[in-house]
Amino acid sequence: MAKDDVIEIDGNVVEALPNATFKVELDNKHIILCHIAGKMRMHYIKIMPGDRVKVELTPYSLDKGRITYRYK
């Protein structure tokens, strides 16, 4: 996947699910399923419900995403 095809959008984590999967409510009120990006897993960055995160979506599947950044 080319990096320019990615859609980046902010949201809030609503619920933590098994296997490092989260329900994220985007700023436009859509709720999507997201998993943690590999670099965040590698550096043991913890994500809790209520955290503000940056999510990457592909144009092919707008209901699943990848969490790439947790705001402080």
UniProtKB/Swiss-Prot annotation:
The keyword Amino-acid biosynthesis does not apply. Residues 1-72 form the S1-like domain. It is found in: Cytoplasm. Keywords: Cytoplasm, Initiation factor, Protein biosynthesis, RNA-binding, rRNA-binding. One of its GO terms (cellular component) is cytosol. InterPro entries: NA-bd_OB-fold, RNA-binding_domain_S1_IF1, TIF_IF1. Its main location: cytoplasm. One of its GO terms (molecular function) is ribosome binding. Belongs to the IF-1 family. Component of the 30S ribosomal translation pre-initiation complex which assembles on the 30S ribosome in the order IF-2 and IF-3, IF-1 and N-formylmethionyl-tRNA(fMet); mRNA recruitment can occur at any time during PIC assembly. One of the essential components for the initiation of protein synthesis. Stabilizes the binding of IF-2 and IF-3 on the 30S subunit to which N-formylmethionyl-tRNA(fMet) subsequently binds. Helps modulate mRNA selection, yielding the 30S pre-initiation complex (PIC). Upon addition of the 50S ribosomal subunit IF-1, IF-2 and IF-3 are released leaving the mature 70S translation initiation complex. HAMAP family: IF_1. This is Translation initiation factor IF-1. It comes from Campylobacter fetus subsp. fetus (strain 82-40). The gene is infA.
